Amino acid sequence: ITTNIKKLVDSNKESIAIASTSTQTEVNENIIQILRQRFNVRNIILDSAVPVDISVVLLNGVSDSLSVDERQNLENYVTNGGNLIIGQNRLAVDIQTQQATPIISDIFELLSNYGFQIEENLVLDKTCGKVNVQQNMGIFRMAVPMDYPFLPIIQTFNEDEVVVSGLEGLRTMFPSEITLDSLHNTMILFQSSDHSSTMSEFYNLNPDPKVNPVFSQLNENGKILAARSEVLNNETGIVGQVILISDSKFFADNGGGGSPENHIFVLNAIDFLLGDSELISLRSREITNRPLEELEDDAKVQWKWANILLPSLFIVGFGFIRLRGEKNRAAMLEELYD
């Protein structure tokens, strides 16, 4: 609905760029197809200056330092009032080998200039996606789906921020915690739940809870996983904006780029950065993921016993009523024939 409305009122499409460095190879076809319904989408390399007609730049997380030209072009774009949405975490994770390696890059210094500090850790959340784990079932070996806290499902949003207003769920992969610098004009967008934790230094990525004890220790408050910053150019008075999601694969096809909920967030973010926020609340109603409310362990036990006892009590009570009715009927027949 929102796409069709926008097509009717837009005479000129804005230009959106999917930026990459000389070392990046991420595929972003899913998000590109979504964006092309409303925008002119171009792929650009940061070793050249960002074209002046680009309204918003999307950038996947980098795993190496930027070249001098790449960093300068990115900085110049934001300084001159450009809008940047970047997915960047602090560790490169290989789920196949279950290894996490710290990323060494000057991108973190650049982001710190905008008020973002990405901690060298991984955030875990009890509200999470699942992975298949091979387990022995008798003589068979089967893939069993298990919760994997390294894939937080986001349900805690800053309702004061239009970008995430009305959203109910997002999917992230191996995010890192974001710390905000109070000296900059930064705002939280979303965070993990209050059943979270972090892992640092030694990374046990095994999905089997039997060999990963941290999965039973998710009792910390929510961690910031996305925020935005307003970047003021003191000389010109122009304000650029940066939105950071601490997930390097948030736009990529092999990561969050395959999630419809994430598509809605990206479209909301672009509309907000373009000063075109009136359709955000309408679009948020298109959310396809409406998860059931999580119950505490005590509540689960109570409902379990209620499900066991109440049917039995109902049957016993119904039996007493029937027995009483039969006795009354027998008494009436005795009186009738006496």
Regions found by a protein language model. Name each.
Residues 1-338:
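Short, surface-exposed patches at the edges or C-terminal ends of soluble domains, predominantly
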